[in-house]
Amino acid sequence: MTSTPDSRSVLTVIILGASGDLAKKKTYPALFGLYLRDLLPSNTIIYGYARSHIEIGDFKARISKGLKGDEEKKKQFLNLLHYHSGKYDEKASYDEFEKLILAEEKKQQGVDKFNRLFYMAIPPSIFIEVSIGIHGSLISKNGWSRVIVEKPFGRDLASSRELVSELGKLFKEKDLFRIDHYLGKEMVQNLMVLRFANAVFEPLWSKSHISSITITFKEDIGTEGRGGYFDQFGIIRDVMQNHLLQVLSLVAMEPPVSLNADDITNEKVKLLRCIQPIKMSEVVLGQYTSDPEGKIPAYLDDEGVPKDSTTPTYAAAVFHINNPRWRGMPFILKCGKALDERKTEVRIQFKRPDNFLFSDDDISRNELVMRIQPGEAVYLKLLSKKPGLENKIEQTELDLSYRHRFENLDLPDAYERLILDSIKGDHNLFVRDDELDVAWQIFTPLLDQIEKEKIKPEPYSFGSRGPKSADELSKKFGFIRSLGYNWPGNSPQGSKK
């Protein structure tokens, strides 16, 4: 581990919900990733807290299974781990936990500052009671205390505002770090660099030259036994209201005054406030059924899902931004589970010039595609003369595939970056309270209408492209799909788009 500029301080990372899946699959592996990169402060303590009674040896064995890397480093990292079982709604449990933390902190030599980072890897239903416990017993007396909160941040505007209000009574906004892990992904961070560091793009970045922008999130797995939890939220709350809206705001916002976190968020909030109400006539909802062979369970067959559930596992919606740059140009957001592939991307389709010289209607549009995952890449689809004696046109691309361009590429996990930024106190990749509020203002009326009218989702087969109506919606708003085109052309990962 590395010494920070403030080497006379201790960092205690406290993971609430340490026995849960999120902590095991994301939080601890991210901390281990930072440890491997020597990015944790030299005086670091990692303390887990949960209701489950687990012996420390069993706890470390459980965490170890999710860690990948050098075995000796893994042993060293596991030596940093501690675990305590206690209640979430009892002050005495937090007081006892505080004594244990203090005892560990006092073992550190030559330090006079004790910083604490709290990671709430817990269900949203207990955010408030755990926050009260942190505030009442665990705040550092000599150092900073910061709190990382995982989504979902409420399930509608009213519950989100209640959560923001209650947390605001306990912590200052500068000490709250609301995680949307998509903001930590390499390609999402690259969106601003591509836009504002390359002079070739900004003159084209408007309705004058772009016909549509499609932001897509596809998973090739279903709910896999988590249907009971998923059914409480649905795909719009789970993905579109947060991940995809964050990407949209970065793609569409005006240039910020600076790269300061508040300046960037100010522009994102301005942009979000320009989004017009979503029309139900411009929304497609879907729910996956079994695969054509009947081997994979349908959503309604998942344990915990009511047999009459109308919760969508797929959604597509058209967004209209009422500002000079984008007025009249559609943004199409799509997300779904149990589809034909795993993919997240931004697809910017350009208009043809008015004096287009080629008559073939099948000629594809120019597209700038930013592949967020998997296989991070940026590629520009162009038209070129096909080599030979005939004057035929074919589609090709200028391609920046990260793993081809950058040797020995080892991209950090999004959670690694976000935890590191919270240690630094950098809010650039986190969600501010007013940003969260306007996001719920956009989606709550739509969600209320869907639930009030019990709108039935369109069925689609597990492993398909999704509801047929979604492709029809895109076509209606000017998106032209390039059939038969493979990217990358010589890779088995290529997908026809």
From Swiss-Prot:
NADP(+) 1 binds at residues 17-24, 51, 151. Pathway: Carbohydrate degradation; pentose phosphate pathway; D-ribulose 5-phosphate from D-glucose 6-phosphate (oxidative stage): step 1/3. Keywords: Carbohydrate metabolism, Cytoplasm, Glucose metabolism, NADP, Oxidoreductase. Disulfide bonds: none annotated. GO terms for cellular component: cytosol; phagocytic vesicle. Its EC number is 1.1.1.49. The active site is at residue 243. It comes from the Eukaryota. It is found in: Cytoplasm, Cytosol. GO terms for biological process: glucose metabolic process; pentose-phosphate shunt, oxidative branch. NADP(+) 2 binds at residues 334, 343, 347, 371, 379-381, 399-401, 465, 487. It catalyses: D-glucose 6-phosphate + NADP(+) = 6-phospho-D-glucono-1,5-lactone + NADPH + H(+). D-glucose 6-phosphate binds at residues 151, 181-185, 219, 238, 337, 342, 373. GO terms for molecular function: glucose-6-phosphate dehydrogenase activity; NADP binding. It is an enzyme of class 1 (oxidoreductase). The keyword Cytoplasm applies. The keyword Cytoplasm applies. Belongs to the glucose-6-phosphate dehydrogenase family. PANTHER family: GLUCOSE-6-PHOSPHATE 1-DEHYDROGENASE, GLUCOSE-6-PHOSPHATE 1-DEHYDROGENASE G6PD. Cytosolic glucose-6-phosphate dehydrogenase that catalyzes the first and rate-limiting step of the oxidative branch within the pentose phosphate pathway/shunt, an alternative route to glycolysis for the dissimilation of carbohydrates and a major source of reducing power and metabolic intermediates for fatty acid and nucleic acid biosynthetic processes. This is Glucose-6-phosphate 1-dehydrogenase. It comes from Dictyostelium discoideum.
